[in-house]
């Protein structure tokens, strides 16, 4: 399962309840900067903005909506991807067991991680990388992440493993100015670590 599908132009215009925003690409400086923390308590305006991003992700996974607006399906989007260098990101997807992950996270921190690593056998994708770059991206198989979540409106501690852990790490990397393409082995993109778990 990829992190996003379909082709998007350099600056994708995303429609949501009469609001527009563009998705910045890997060529833009904001995606290579370490984002700053959000002041807490979060304002109602910022909370609603992040909730909008969660709703956008839901809509992007509807084929009719995605086709109508010419956008890619996504499971996560971080603030730097829309030109805002702040430590927050939105997540929405269901895992293979039907468990729903719906979060708008502010100032997330990975507080622990496993020695075991994992990777997506299909490779990763990103809304900020218009054309997918092939190769394996190795990440922690299991993480514990703490953040303030605007969906539940409270502090949360998330214990994630497998595909969900990969998705959250992908978005977390955006907050540190790192893209998945930065983590692909340039000499051997499909190098298989025998100790890692293929997902």
Question: Where does each model-flagged region fall?
Answer:
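Positively charged
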Residues: 7-199
């Amino acid at each position: 399962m990829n992190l996003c599908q379909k082709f998007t132009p350099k600056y994708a215009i995303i429609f949501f309840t009469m609001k527009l925003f563009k998705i910045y690409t890997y060529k833009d400086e904001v995606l290579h900067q370490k984002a700053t923390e959000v002041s807490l308590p979060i304002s109602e305006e910022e909370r609603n903005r992040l909730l909008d991003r969660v709703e956008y992700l839901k809509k992007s996974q509807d084929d009719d909506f995605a086709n109508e607006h010419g956008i890619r399906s996504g499971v996560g989007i971080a603030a730097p991807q829309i030109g805002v260098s702040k430590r927050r990101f939105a997540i929405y997807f269901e895992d293979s067991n039907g468990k729903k992950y719906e979060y708008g996270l502010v100032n997330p921190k990975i507080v622990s991680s496993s020695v075991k690593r994992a990777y997506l056998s299909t490779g990763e994708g990103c809304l900020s990388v218009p054309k997918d770059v092939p190769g394996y991206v190795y990440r922690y198989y299991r993480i514990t992440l703490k953040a303030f979540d605007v969906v539940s409106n409270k502090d949360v501690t998330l214990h994630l493993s497998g595909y969900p852990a990969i998705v959250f790490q992908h978005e977390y990397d955006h907050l540190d100015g790192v893209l998945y393409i930065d983590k692909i082995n340039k000499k051997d993109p499909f190098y298989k670590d025998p100790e890692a778990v293929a997902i």
